[in-house]
From Swiss-Prot:
Keyword Cell wall biogenesis/degradation recorded: no
Residue span(s) of domain Sushi: 1239-1306
Organism: Caenorhabditis elegans
Signal sequence range: 1-20
UniProt protein name: Uncharacterized protein F26C11.3
Amino acid sequence: MRNNLIYTMFLSCLHFETFCQNTTTSNDDCEALSQDLDNKNPVECCTTEAFDFLDKKYPNWRKVNKYVRSPYINELRFMGCCNKTISTSAILTTTPLTTSSTTLEIYTTDSDSTTAETTSVPTTTTSIQCGVLANTSCCNLKVTECLSKQYEDWRNVTLIKGYERELEKCDCVLTSSSTETGTVKFLDREFFRVFSSAEIASTTSLPTTTSPSLNCYWLSEPSNFSEWIDGKQTNLRYNGGCCSETSIQVLNSSDSTRWILTTSDSWNKANALINLLYCTPNACPQQSMLWTNCSNLSTTTSSSTMLSSTTLLTTETETRESSSTGSTQTTTPSTEPSTTITTPMEQSSTVSSVQKTRTSEDKPSSSTTVPTSASTSESSTSSPMAETSSSSTTSQSSPASTSTVPESSTVGSTPTTGLTTLSTNEQSTSTSSGGHSTSTFGTTSETPETSTDFTATSTSSSSDSSTQSSNAQTSTIENGSTTTNFTSAPSTSSTPATPTTTYNWPTGGTTWMLPSGEIVQAHKTFFSSFNYFQVLSESLIAYPNCTTVLMQLIYNPRTKETRTEITSDAEGCKKTSSTPTPSSTSVHSTTATPSTTPGTTTYNWPTGGTTRMLPSGEIILSESLIAYPNCTTVLMQLIYNPSTKETRTETTTDADGCKKTSSTSSSTPSLKHSTTPTPTPGTTTYNWPTGGTTRMLPSGEIILSESLIAYPNCTTVLMQLIYTPSTNKTRTETTTDTEGCKKTSTISSSSSKFSITPTPTPSSGTTTYNWPTGGTTRTLPSGEIILSESLIAFQNCTTVLMQLIYNPSTNKTRTETTTDAEGCKKTSSTSKISTTPTSPTSSKPTPTSTSMTTTYNWPTGGTTRTLPSGEIILSESLIAYKNCTTVLMQLIYNPSTNKTRTETTTDAQGCKATSSTSLKPTSPSSSTASPPTTTYNWPTGGTTRTLPSGEIILSESLIAYKNCTTVLMQLIYNPSTNKTRTETTTDAQGCKATITTPTPITTTYNWPTGGTTRTLPSGEIILSESLIAYKNCTTVLMQLIYNPSTNKTRTETTSDAQGCKATSTTQTPTTFNWPTGGTTRTLPSGEIILSESLIAYKNCTTVLMQLIYNPSKNTTRTETTSDAEGCKATSSGTTSTMSPGTTGGTTVSRTTNSNNPIDSSTLETTTFAWPTGGTTRMLPSGEIIISESLTAFPNCTTVLKQLVYNPTTNTTRTDTISDSEGCKATSTAKPTTVISSTATCSSLNLNLNSTTRPTSSEIKDSYSVGEKIYHICEKDYSFEIALQPLKIYQCLNGGAWSGTPEKCVATGKSEL
């Protein structure tokens, strides 16, 4: 049993990632680890485990530029893969794997003793690799296997703090009160020592200066360090003088430094001392003065106290300096105890500044000369600061002011016992060429005025004089041994030779990815040599050759300065999933934790455009897809969580992403690329979508807009408008996919085309729809509003409905996609109907006749739809006939030809496709002559009705047939299933159910108001129509029809001898009130016609009565206009006998009305009201109908009068259309009103400048009541106030004129 357990534990170890062992290898690859920026010792990390670790985690690490390998070495150190400097008291032992338990030596603290004692704890750490859980109750096979299944890299964690929840999932519970050996409780924080498989630390006696209540870890151990730190070889002798509560607090204050307490890596220890603790007040009690040049993290203080005789640290410094022209190396030999240390350069500003040395006169920009008693050189020369920039500035109050400090100044006379340092050097380089810039900027720390114990490291020079460069500032020590040397910081790796653009920094939403895959929000801080910075923004540019360039805008909160860092990676496109992009600068070479190295993927979030809602309720605010030449795609999504009000970034990497955009059913991708449109049918030029989301290509180019075109042969063409920032030009790219129609449907649905079932949008992002703009919105039963929608039909019968939906309650917008695999069957045609008009006198219309009575108005506003050919359906209407045939009429616009046409599609079994309930349908009889007389459009707007079942009737339409059959069509929404269906109910006796109350015998319907027309299947346009019911039960439908092909207008009349049975059979008197409701019309004078009515008398006289409101006077009056010969001017066609059900002949004539008073004795009744609402209507020819009226006369003649304005010729005419057989059953009655007028109006004083009508010869001395003057401006002129080219003045009762005369002025101008 024991052997089985050991064997099982051994096998489990093979599956886990192990920490590095410290076995030196003779591998020739050691040179690869030495060719980094800092030129680190190649032997330091040359271990077999180090190469195994890198090869496993970063397979391509050897291909990375040799100058940017520092992050890899830093991570190797952190993982314990490099040789360590072990103190003389430390013992390193290795426990054989065959033992089931070992004794682990750890530190524990005895409050009564100043030394640490050893505690032996049985553990299996070395067998099962417990990592940070070593020496805890969770160090067992069950917990480690559970963690390995869920978190592959869990052994890389150095602290348990913050991972309690993850541990609980694997039945591991550790509390702050735990008494587990190995847990150190301090300041309410828990820290756990990390032991590798080959490391067991022994006890070490603490110095007598160490507080007995503190566990200072290695801080209490005197040590010798010899490390390359920040580009310099530094030898350190540390006496253990930084063991204090302050040091512990400083290191524990950040996750970036907390782990250093338990590290065994000498490089991290030395770096923490030099760049953090020595600069922190009270961190090192034995240190007499603070360092002021290692970082800006701590507040500097000044003191004139000499260093104590106890030497905390002595160093031997070797400085390597490189520049673009060559390299120089200066070595200061060790002359113990007088030694120096050079601290790292800090790079953190976009505006260069030079070293500031305070003098007694506090002139920060001056050069200071300090005499000393020691002398090793008579003169020295400061090398100029490498600075080449047209934008860099040097803050300097005087060019070269000098201040001399007296020799009696407090300068250490025995510097051999002091700590000698180099004040931080600074450099700023900026080169600009060809629009591309590479910048590295920095600032320096400040040396306190009284810090006289610090002198500058000497740099040998052959010059006998001391000089100062014009763009550098030098601190010189006369007769001394040292000068300040300004050196260049390591420059960033070069970018590709042909960079494409300079990007605006992304605002908001910027993130960066750590090598662990974690995403860090913008404004997160990171540490470089323990200095703390913020990444304000960053952008990644990917080039076709696989190179990526990371641009970062970095802010230093301490100095309040900003700089730009540029990092390139020749293999960057391959590292978007997990591999980090190392940087050549110390900012990215984070020594604290490798995870602070910025990742390779940071995108500019697209602004504007459509948001999408995830099933979880989260909202995708923005997203971007980047495709790399190696087929990898990276989808970045900015996601907002409404419940937590937080935003996060999701990154999805797909190594085979490019294959998702081509056919999945074929063995080879069918995607073809070309720069010109393919010669497929129905190609056209589209208006590029405006607004919305932009995307960036790997080349750095930007896709400003794109559109997907689907053709009947299943081919899709993706057109992209691409902008190249480097050339500032735009081009069009066309991508063709012969199997494209098969890739847009992700769910095969068999529900009706009205189904509102959302389907996921393909992640490949191959389809972008232009949302229709403008028009009418629609409201769903849930209260949400459909802002826009688009339907795409594919050759394989699939239809995809895309809807842009706004939710008023959440103030959010989402996109719904509904796919119907059988969508084309809902609209497919079984026969094409004729578009040639048939004879208007046909007594038995067929579904192809132009005299159909069931015609739908084209929907106005609202949503357009795009056909696979690229044409746009502006509007459409479905007509249902009694024989079950349905006719779909579509008004289609062709952008390429800029023309509009009407398409008609019939379905012989159309009524069956919409009926889901069998209610004993009765086919309407075909024995009668006319088609159905009444069909209602689906009601628009947001009004709905709720059924007892809870379902909602969104809209409904009733069709009444002449055989008394009615068909009710209802569009019903089911909230529980979130689907919509159509119900059809047929009633063979439906017409009888409506006879309930008597109504007036004479019923006249107003012409449809507004400017909307309706198109017949033949392509002809119904400009207006009216239904009249007579006392003999006959109903007459009159339609004013325009034929675009012949450019003529005619009147169609359809009568139904039994039409009145559905409404009324009781005779009532005829009294016409002013028409109410609807929209008013405004006259050119600015007056408003509230209502109007036209009366026709048997003596042929017509009288127009208008109720007019004057806004300026706030009064209302009645205007009456008569025409004594009105009826005669309209009847000119051939008279024929007409019975109900037949259509009479029509003629069109144009006459000029004569306005004469009438004899009241001749008045008869039959009054048609002018249409209420609307202003003017435009004919297909471009002419404008200013006003019109339909009149029915006792002789059965009907007359349509239209006042038509032609903008092209700037003239007005009257068109009269008559039908001699319009009606012969009209009843008459005596009128109740007599209207007469005998007054006249004097001539108007008109300004005829820039007018075409009237001419001076046309102006009369007087006008009769009702006469009009048409005042028309010349081309490009309009009236000064009315802002239109036409005004009509009419003679009123009492001799006054309607309207105020105005003068014509040039369009767009007005005169005061």
